[in-house]
């Protein structure tokens, strides 16, 4: 069974979104300076602060996804509304820098998750079901290179394959026992896997906001790029999942890898 012409166009669009320039490159273009400069202005304890903020944000996102996300029907996603909320939240991060991250990031992450769920619904996902909820959380791992990645092995399908077992174990645990024991190994492993990738992008955001004179306006713009990135990842991710519901998954991956962008 071949893939319809319109669906090939959608697949190409998804690949364009998913394999786009990195978050760091986009932030550097905004600032007009390499993002590495920002790391020079972070305190010695910044890695621990980012790790704690990232884990806290993803734990909150997991709770939000499992307990509150549903199938309210909307034909389109409210990308602009969520973007405005994230921009407003980012202004505080730009003003107060790293100390504000532990407060600002969980709020921004929840706003982004709402937007991701909105995009998922617009691509035909049933968000009341557990598997699509976990797929929404999976978006936070897209577009960030983990320390365990080797060279170019960071493409979309490679990341999904790397996370597959961890996601499956967490989904099975939640299906049986819910979130009653949040320190359960399956859930801890899921948060750790997501943190290893999402944390890289949070570090880049923190470094950008640490650059002197970035201010509230700069912080707001950085958050705009931050949510833009994850909205793009979500759109590409859920387009592919929609196509996988229509065609053989291996066929979709083969066609994806053949496409030039």
Question: Where do the language-model regions lie?
Answer:
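Terminal, membrane-proximal amphipathic helices
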Residues: 1-89, 114-261
């Amino acid at each position: 069974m071949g893939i319809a012409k319109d669906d090939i166009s959608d697949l190409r669009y998804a690949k364009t979104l998913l394999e786009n320039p990195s978050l760091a490159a986009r932030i550097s273009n905004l600032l007009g300076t390499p993002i590495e400069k920002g790391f020079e202005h972070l305190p010695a304890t910044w890695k621990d602060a980012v790790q704690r903020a990232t884990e806290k944000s993803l734990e909150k996102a997991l709770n939000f996804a499992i307990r509150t996300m549903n199938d309210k029907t909307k034909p389109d996603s409210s990308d602009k509304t969520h973007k405005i909320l994230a921009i407003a939240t980012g202004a505080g991060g730009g003003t107060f820098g790293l100390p504000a991250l532990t407060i600002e990031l969980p709020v921004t992450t929840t706003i982004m998750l709402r937007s991701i769920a909105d995009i998922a619904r617009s691509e035909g996902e049933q968000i009341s079901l557990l598997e699509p909820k976990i797929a929404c959380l999976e978006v936070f791992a897209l577009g960030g290179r983990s320390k365990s990645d080797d060279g170019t092995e960071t493409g979309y399908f490679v990341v999904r394959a790397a996370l597959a077992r961890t996601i499956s174990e967490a989904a099975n645990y939640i299906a049986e026992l819910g979130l009653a024991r949040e320190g359960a190994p399956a859930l801890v492993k899921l948060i750790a896997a997501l943190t290893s990738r999402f944390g890289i992008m949070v570090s880049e955001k923190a470094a950008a906001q640490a650059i002197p004179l970035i201010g509230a306006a700069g912080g707001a713009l950085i958050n705009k790029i931050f949510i833009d990135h994850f909205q793009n990842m979500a759109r590409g991710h859920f387009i592919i999942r929609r196509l996988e519901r229509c065609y053989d998954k291996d066929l979709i991956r083969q066609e994806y890898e053949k496409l030039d962008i």
